[in-house]
Amino acid sequence: MITGEPVMVMHGGPGAGSHSSATRFFDLQRYRVILFDQRGCGKSSPSASEDDATAALTDNTTRHLIDDVSALRHELNIDGKMHVFGGSWGSTLALAYAIAHPATVQTLILRGVFLCRRADVDYFFQGNAAEFAPDPLAMPVPGTYLDFPTAWRHFVDAIPPKDRGDIVKGLAKIFAVPPRTEAERARLVKAASACVAWEGSASRLNHDENSHGQPNGKYALTVARIMVYYMINGGFLDAKSEASRDNNYILDNVARLSGCACWATDIIPIEPHDCSPV
């Protein structure tokens, strides 16, 4: 029988899949670290990397993922409270799970907290895309692009100019149609790779702006499709109402977490991570 304090790891993306590197944050002699691939990605099937991703995106919402975590608890005989760990989208899912099932959460350990509000998504994806200027500093619109201008140009160049008024909607339009020819598939992979490369660039403090290596096509399709599908639906955070990009679900329900200890990790120059209670 496997013992140790259970830690449920929520991976990012959404769509990035789990990775064993997440275990390095824990003493495996003390903690039982649980990794799982969310619907449509990693080792889960069907995969969003297929030409037609309809099956992978059907019954794939935050509510379904929360139910999957509950099913895992049952399957792994976790009867008491557990630690819940996640970064970026993983922090979103961790918070949504804790709001739904606060009695099962001992601690929340979060990094790169993402609340999945329209303002958060627009800050990351939109920037000056509507009136794309080669010199991002010529545009006063705030956004992540100001910190990564070269990577931003590579990203926006993959989006048709007519669809840059709403980048997320434009990407959703591209990913909605299964490719019928190799040329169409190449365009699809190009857009997906640009999307994932941008996300990777803007998620790292030490990213080399002059490096524009593209992620694996299958991986890029998986992450980009699932990520855009969730972002355009506000992360499917409120199961009681229609999916919407205009919500503040987590902060509106944060009082439900009053019984959970919550730690947020801050990236600082000297050390990789520093934990402080919030």
Placement of each model-derived feature along the sequence:
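Conserved acidic catalytic loop of the alpha/beta-hydrolase fold
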Residues: 63-82
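Short glycine-enriched nucleophile-adjacent loop
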Residues: 91-102, 108
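Conserved alpha/beta-hydrolase fold motif
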Residues: 84-85, 264
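A catalytic-pocket lid/entrance helix-loop region that shapes and gates access to the active site
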Residues: 103-173
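Alpha/beta-hydrolase fold active-site neighborhood
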Residues: 163-242
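Conserved HGGG/HGGXW glycine-rich cap/lid loop of the alpha/beta-hydrolase fold
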Residues: 1-50
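Conserved alpha/beta-hydrolase "acid-adjacent" motif
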Residues: 238, 266-276
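Short beta-strand/loop motif that positions the catalytic acidic residue
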Residues: 257-259, 264-266
